[in-house]
Amino acid sequence: SNGKLTYTNIVTVYVTLPQPKTFYNDVTQDGGICGNNLVKDALDTLKAMPDYNSTLVPLFDALTVDNNNYVIACNVFFAGANSGVWAMGLWPHSSALYYAGAQELTPGGKKIFPYQITDIGNRLAIGTFAHENGHMLCGFPDLYDYDYDSVGGAGVFCLMGSGGGDLNPSQVCAYLKYAAGWATITELTSSSSLLATVSSRGTNFNHFYRFQKPGSSTEYFLAEGRYKTGRDAGLPGCGLLIWHIDELGDN
């Protein structure tokens, strides 16, 4: 975001839930139901701690809420492997407590409704966490093909594609940066002639170039510079990246 998004989490203690993992990781159940059960029981267990009101509630006062008094982001990690079954059982996802209902976090005040869950093992993996926060915090869509029947999608060049590498996930692509208000663009036309500078750092960071398809307000080409440094160290290549954007497409 180049400093336009500041995101700070309050980390609580580990808690042991009242049911075995097999209860929450029921692969015959929709992942949203299992996630709701996990998050609700985790919050109930946390709030039952003797020092909850004196120790954690004062920290939670700093959390940002929306107009409904819902905390804008709640991250829950569960130990061990995920279900391995797409969207079933304990599958990492971002959603809300549609089944359990909003849960009170502070007495008469802030509530938990949006959440994301991610499995955590013995590695400092942040890729899935970052991807799911793209959904929860920023409203970013998935930019990969759900049924893998085409070669479309953003691939490893976007966090919301397949760029959520465990230890060092890729940046968000130019399209989503601009949609989030993190970027500026220069509009190009068929008669444009300019010497453009694209950079992964410095004054031109998050500045892109757009050529609109004639007669369309939702389809265009977007150019950015990507380099194998920082969050992009794992990219297969670097240089000028030109995206073909169709905002009315689906995955």
Task: Label every model-predicted segment.
Residues 73-237, 243-248:
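Extracellular hydrolytic enzyme modules, especially secreted metalloproteases
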Residues 1-108:
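Active-site-proximal segments of metallohydrolase catalytic domains
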